[in-house]
Amino acid sequence: MIRWLHISDLHFNDDDMSTIFMRDELPKYLKEKDIKCDYIFCTGDIRTANASPNIFQEESVQYLIELCTAVGITTDRLFIVAGNHDVDRNVAGRDEAIRRICFQRNGYYNPKYGKIKEDDLNAIYEGQAEFRKFLSKIYTDDRVSKYSDPLKPHFNIETDDFNVLHIDSTLTYTKEQEAV
């Protein structure tokens, strides 16, 4: 039997007390109940949208490592994908590239062919610079390299138990899509 923990919306850089409380209690609970897992999946929004400063706090790195330790795994069994809050949506050229690609279905992207122009992928990729720095504090260089090719925004990691397809759902997300 495979056991995993799925976490999302950690929202570091946010001072909401309920968010902080839930985050703080999870590792304690896992240790107290001696819950062991084979894998952890972290599906984005590690930080709050367009955090200021636009960085990932060291606390978020330590937290994910602590969760791995609490359930008895190493970080190679932690799988992370960026959420819409984990990218810098204000990077120069990013919004313009997304508009060219697909904004309100007036862009050039056709799902039948699945092609996005290299210049546009590079512009979008710049919004993930801090996310990749964050990952480099958790993963080996080999693992970080999988996140480091703007022309291959999606990738697969094979494990002994299954394959994990990492889908970059932030490719076409703009700051104007943020819920109020």
Positions of predicted regions on the chain:
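N-terminal active-site segment of His-dependent metallophosphoesterases
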Residues: 1-59, 63-78, 88-89
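Extended active-site neighborhood of metal-dependent phosphoesterases/phosphodiesterases
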Residues: 61-179
